[in-house]
Structures are given as C-alpha cells and as structure tokens.
C-alpha cells in the first residue's frame, strides 16, 4: 500500500520501548497492550468474548489458537474501525477497560493520529449525486477553504455537492481527511428498484447478521470487505446484501463454475425469477428481461481487452452503460490492484462489497483492497464457528512419503521442474494416496484429491480409476462430474487441479488429500481446507473431516509445506505428522509395488516434455487465451516469490481466441 493513503503523522510514527505498568487488579482483565501496538488476549478470562469482539473491530488478527490470541493495531485496522462508527474516545476507553496494563503512551498517540481525521467526512450518494457530509462545521469549512476541493464543489445553504469525485477523493487523502463512501439506497429514486427478497425458509445465522449490520447503518450501505471462512455462508451474506439494496447488481467470480453456483444459490435463497438473473461467460451471453436484475460474470470476462464476438460485445456494452447499485466481488483476495482498477473503472456502481475467506497474499498487495474497495467490515474466528457447528471440525495431517532410491537419485541432479514432478510422482506417495482413498471410501467418506501438476493429476486419476477435472475440461463435463460426485454412491473420489481451489461448493466432501500444491501459498492451503469445512454432516456427534497433505521426504515439498500451513496454524489448527503408514505394505495389489513398475514410472517422468510439466495455471492460460498478466492476477500468483522456472514464453506462440 502506498503510504500516501496514511495520515502524515501515522507515516512517521515510532514505537519506542516502554515499560509495561500493570494495574492493581490486572488479574481481572483479559488483554495485554504491548508498546508496539501488539495485543495479547487470554481467551480463558471471563470477559474475553467481549474483548475479542472489540479487537476484531479495531485490530488485525495475527494468531488465534485456543487459549492465547494475538492482534496487531495498524493504521488500516483503525481506518476500518472509524468506518463502522467507532470514535477515537470509544477505541481508547474500551481498550483501556479490557487491558491488564496502563496503555503505553506511543500506542495511545498512534491511535489518536490515525483516527483523529479518519471517519470525519463521508461521501454519500443520494438522488444519483455525490454529497459530502462532515462531522462538524469546522471540518466542512476546512474543506471548502481548500482551493482544489472548493473548485470541485457546488455549495448551497443545505448541501455540498461534489462535481469531480475522483479529484476530491484524492485531495481529501492528501489533507488527511479520507472520504468514507456510503450509498443512501433507500432514497435513491433515480435507479430502478426490483422486487427481490429472501424466501421465508432462508435462515440467517447470527454472525452473518453481524456482518450485514456492519455494512448497513442508518439506512445506508458502506463499501467494504467481509472475511468469513470457506463453508460458513459468504454467498448468503452477499445475496442478503443485494436483497437489501434491491438495485441492479453485478457479481464478479473467479470461474465459470462459480458463476453457475452463484446463480443456483441466488435462486435457492430468493424469490427472483430465472429471467432476471443472467450469466455472462464464454458459454452464456444473457441479459435480464426487466428494467433491472442481476448479472453474474468472471473477472477475466470483464477485464478481457481483446476482440470479442458481436454477441459478447453487445453484453459488454450493456454492462458498461448500466448504473449498478451493488458491485459484488467474490474471492476478492485473488485479484490484484491493477485488475480491480480496470474492473472498477469499466462499470458505474454505487456500492462495493468484497467477500473472501483468506485476506492474505504472498506479496504486499493485499492492503490495496482497503482503499480500492473499502475497509474490512468484519472477520470471523474460525475456531469459534467450528465450536458452534457452523463449519466442520477438522483433523489435519502431514504425511511424509519416503522417496525410492532411484527417484531420489534423479531428484538430486534434475532441473527444478523435473525435481518437482519427481517428488509428486514418488511411488511411495502414490501408494499412500491409494491407501488413504481406500480407507476413507470404506468409511463412507467422499474424497477430493488436489494436484497442481496436470501430468500428476492425470497419472494418479487414470491409475486409480477416478474422474478428474482440470483447465481444459469443458463446463458441461465439469458440472456432470461434480453432480455425479454429489449424488452417485459409486463415485466417491474425484481429482481436481487448482481450478477447484475456490468457489466450488461440495458439501458432500468429508476428506481431502493434497498430492501437490503451489509452492508456499498460505492462501491456497486455506482455500483447499475450505472445500471440506461445509460438510453436511458437521453437526453429527463427534463428526470430523480429514485433511491430508502428502509430501516427499527430504525434498523442497517439506520446506514449502511449513510455509503453507502458517495461516491455518494462526487460525488455531494443528497438523499431526505421520512419518510412515505401515498398513500400505499389507496390500499385495498396491500400485507400483515392483521395482520394474517403479522404473517404468521413473522413465515416463524423465521423458516428460516441458508442456507436460506445466501447472494448471499455465494450461488454463492457453485454454482461455487471455493475457498472462490478467490470468496471473486473477489466480493470485502475480508477485509471489516461490517459483524457480526455466526461461521460456510459450504464451507468445499461441493465438488468442474470441471470448
């Protein structure tokens, strides 16, 4: 995040070491405030739940295991706090009330510096015009006295209308008064409203209601981001938001499968007719029949800047000429700033809502979302939702698979790409995967096996006789396989590439096995765990789901595995290490049992071409024919520093096709 977005004093703030002074009755309180704005919460104290709810509003969660939580107060978290109505005095007094120690002077000064000007002026959209609301006349006078702002305002006795919104927003940041955007949708008589409500059978959970209360206040809608674990009902939160605003809504997803699921869920939970909820994908080019409705599309469809078919261009023109009440952004964490700026500039909208499970990236671009979309409105505690039965309880395992001598000998001398495939195709890992599938199918589980490597995905699935989905799999075939997995008692295991990482709803799945992954991506690890958190049987007594990550011993996989697990460990999950599975060797019919079979497998790996070594990201890139920069952005890999690749550019050799 560019520091120009921060108050000038906050940019220069230092945190000198200070002595922690305990209160006389400190044992009655639940949190410690360190001199560097780190807060440690003891969850076993009597008032810890109230303290935790407050900390979520003013600080970033760092780590939340069972008994001790860590939070960090940042300029961005304080921006979010004042955006939802907390004042400087509210923050200071409540923090002091829960604290065991006297608040360090540097922390108090930092809070004051960050919140003194934040939240004091609002940009309100009323009657299709932009107005400024100030906390008091002194602040309003300061704005009007600024020459740049004054030249872009239309001031009357009753209101201050903004003429050039972007210029005023930029100038307000420069003078330490960033604008908070609110949409007065109830008084918007210019945009058409349409009849859409939740069905009487649709039930909203308490934490979902809390999310929505943060977004809607005094009859207005705030732009911002809501963070909920996979499987906890992010989609329903978005659907409830659009039924509250009741204006035309544009929903952006990461994939065509996600588009279908958003459409199905919206029709399931609301009374909308199928004619007014439409899709814009490479397969469907639809528009609603009434004056307003819902369009669901993907980020890449909207950001694509090549030549479109006449039918697609017609829909794109309609999207750009429509004024949208709500822009709903699913899986908001995976799309970097450049794509968001493009998407946001393409469409006229009044309110933005971002939904995500993991507000984390391996680069430093996640903070861009604070100002491109809005502040974080709410973030849930995974373990709290698990304890209440809203998401499933999970047992996580890291399974170490020893490399055979021949495979490891080649591993030590091959290129980085071949090394990676050798560690994935390790015969011991094959056997471990086969054993775990057999064991869990016998228990009645539905199993998802993930592999980033397309070559390994096909090899495992074909060898074990299981269906698989990856980039080139057609949309119809994808939906057919997923339907069979959900309903057919004979189809209990499917293999997925990284196309299944996000937005695939499979509540039947109760076991996940990961045979390869994207290096050290914490986000991907959490997203994959999320595929089994929504298990239908989660409320059954003693029911648990299982997450296995198979890694080849003494390879780079072990190094990346610890990095990947960090986010989940911070959410309170623990990984049990399985160093060996002796039961594997009791199966006389196990795959690649003999030396000759293992040698054949090794030869096939060594003879693999560069094309076969590609991950599914690259395969998808060629399949849909978009610029590499767009696709890397939409998958969240842009800027990550975990890859070592050969110098090559196959993309330039491929022609792009029309969308």
From Swiss-Prot:
Q: Which residues form the Helicase C-terminal domain?
A: 431-589
Give the family per the record: Belongs to the helicase family. RAD25/XPB subfamily.
Lineage of producing organism? Eukaryota, Fungi, Fungi incertae sedis, Microsporidia, Nosematidae
Entry's localization field: Nucleus
Alphabetized UniProt keyword annotations? ATP-binding, DNA damage, DNA repair, DNA-binding, Helicase, Hydrolase, Isomerase, Nucleotide-binding, Nucleus, Transcription, Transcription regulation
One of its Pfam families is Helicase_C_3
Alphabetical GO CC annotations of the entry are: nucleotide-excision repair factor 3 complex; transcription factor TFIIH holo complex; transcription preinitiation complex
* Reactions catalysed, as given in the entry: Couples ATP hydrolysis with the unwinding of duplex DNA by translocating in the 3'-5' direction; ATP + H2O = ADP + phosphate + H(+)
Domain Helicase ATP-binding: residue ranges: 215-377
Any GO molecular function = DNA binding
The record describes the protein's role as: ATP-dependent 3'-5' DNA helicase/translocase; binds dsDNA rather than ssDNA, unzipping it in a translocase rather than classical helicase activity. Component of the general transcription and DNA repair factor IIH (TFIIH) core complex. When complexed to CDK-activating kinase (CAK), involved in RNA transcription by RNA polymerase II. Also involved in transcription-coupled nucleotide excision repair (NER) of damaged DNA. In NER, TFIIH acts by opening DNA around the lesion to allow the excision of the damaged oligonucleotide and its replacement by a new DNA fragment.
Please provide the Gene Ontology terms (biological process) for this protein: nucleotide-excision repair; transcription initiation at RNA polymerase II promoter
Q: Where does it primarily localize?
A: nucleus
Q: What is its EC number?
A: 5.6.2.4
State if DNA-binding is listed as a keyword: yes
Q: Give the protein name, as stated in the record.
A: General transcription and DNA repair factor IIH helicase/translocase subunit XPB
Q: Which PANTHER family match?
A: GENERAL TRANSCRIPTION AND DNA REPAIR FACTOR IIH HELICASE SUBUNIT XPB, RAD25/XP-B DNA REPAIR HELICASE
Binding-site residues, ATP: 228-235
Q: Which PROSITE patterns match?
A: HELICASE_ATP_BIND_1, HELICASE_CTER
Gene responsible for this protein = SSL2
The record's subunit annotation is: Component of the 7-subunit TFIIH core complex composed of XPB/SSL2, XPD/RAD3, SSL1, TFB1, TFB2, TFB4 and TFB5, which is active in NER. The core complex associates with the 3-subunit CTD-kinase module TFIIK composed of CCL1, KIN28 and TFB3 to form the 10-subunit holoenzyme (holo-TFIIH) active in transcription.
The UniProt entry annotates the motif DEAH box at 330-333
């Amino acid at each position: 995040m560019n520091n120009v977005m921060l108050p000038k004093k906050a940019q220069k703030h230092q945190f000198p070491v200070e002595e922690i002074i305990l209160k006389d009755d400190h044992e009655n309180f639940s949190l410690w405030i360190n001199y560097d704005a780190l807060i440690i919460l003891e969850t076993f104290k009597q008032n810890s739940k109230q303290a935790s709810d407050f900390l979520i509003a003013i600080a970033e969660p760092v780590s939340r295991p069972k008994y001790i939580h860590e939070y960090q107060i940042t300029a961005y978290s304080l921006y979010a706090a004042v955006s939802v109505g907390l004042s400087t005095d509210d923050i200071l007094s409540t923090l002091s009330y829960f604290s065991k120690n006297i608040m360090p002077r540097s922390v108090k000064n930092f809070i004051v510096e960050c919140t003194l000007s934040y939240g004091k002026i609002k940009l309100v959209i009323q009657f299709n015009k932009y107005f400024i609301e100030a906390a008091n006349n002194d602040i309003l006078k300061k704005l009007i006295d600024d020459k740049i702002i004054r030249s872009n305002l239309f001031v009357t006795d009753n209101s201050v209308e903004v003429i050039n919104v972007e210029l005023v927003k930029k100038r307000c940041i420069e003078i330490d008064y960033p604008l908070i955007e609110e949409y007065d949708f109830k008084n918007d008589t210019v945009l058409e409203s349409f009849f859409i409500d939740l069905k009487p059978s649709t039930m909203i959970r308490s934490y979902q209601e809390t999310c929505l209360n943060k977004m809607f206040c005094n009859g207005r809608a705030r732009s911002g981001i809501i963070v909920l674990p996979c499987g906890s009902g992010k989609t329903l939160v978005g659907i409830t938001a659009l039924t509250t605003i009741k204006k035309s809504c544009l929903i952006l997803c990461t994939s065509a499968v996600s588009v279908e699921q958003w459409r199905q869920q919206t029709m399931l939970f609301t009374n909308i007719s199928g004619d007014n909820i439409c899709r814009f994908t490479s397969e469907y080019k639809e528009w609603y029949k009434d004056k307003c409705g819902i369009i669901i599309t993907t980020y890449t469809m909207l950001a694509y800047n090549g030549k479109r078919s006449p039918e697609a261009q017609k829909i794109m023109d309609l999207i750009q000429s429509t004024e949208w009440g709500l822009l709903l952004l699913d899986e908001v964490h995976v799309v970097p700033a450049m794509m968001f700026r493009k998407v946001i500039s393409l469409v006229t909208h009044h309110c933005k809502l971002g939904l995500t499970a993991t507000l984390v990236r391996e680069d430093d671009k996640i903070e861009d979302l604070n100002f491109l979309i809005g502040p974080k409105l709410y973030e849930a505690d995974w373990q709290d939702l698990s304890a209440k039965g809203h998401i499933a309880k999970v047992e996580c395992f890291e399974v170490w698979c020893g490399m055979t001598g021949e495979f490891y000998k080649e591993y030590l001398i091959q290129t980085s790409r071949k090394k990676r495939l050798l560690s994935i195709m390790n015969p011991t890992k094959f056997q471990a995967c086969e054993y775990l599938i057999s064991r869990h199918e016998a228990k009645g589980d539905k199993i998802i096996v993930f592999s980033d490597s397309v070559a390994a995905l096909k090899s495992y699935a074909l060898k074990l006789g299981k269906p698989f989905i990856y980039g080139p799999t057609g949309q119809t075939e994808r939906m057919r396989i997923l339907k069979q997995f959900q309903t057919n008692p004979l189809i209990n295991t499917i293999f997925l590439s990284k196309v299944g990482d996000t937005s695939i709803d499979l509540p039947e799945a109760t076991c996940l096995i990961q045979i390869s992954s994207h290096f050290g991506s914490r986000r991907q690890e959490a997203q994959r765990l999320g595929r089994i958190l929504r298990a239908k049987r989660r409320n059954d007594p003693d029911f648990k789901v299982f997450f296995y990550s198979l890694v080849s011993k003494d390879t780079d996989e072990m190094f990346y595995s610890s990095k990947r697990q960090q986010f989940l460990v911070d959410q309170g999950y623990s990984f049990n290490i399985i160093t060996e599975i002796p039961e594997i060797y009791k199966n006389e019919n196990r795959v690649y049992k003999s030396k000759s079979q293992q040698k054949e497998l090794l030869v096939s790996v060594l003879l693999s071409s560069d094309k076969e070594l590609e991950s599914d990201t690259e395969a998808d890139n060629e399949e849909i024919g978009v610029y590499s920069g767009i696709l890397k952005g939409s998958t969240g890999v842009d800027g990550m520093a975990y890859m070592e690749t050969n110098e090559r550019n196959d993309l330039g050799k491929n022609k792009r096709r029309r969308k």
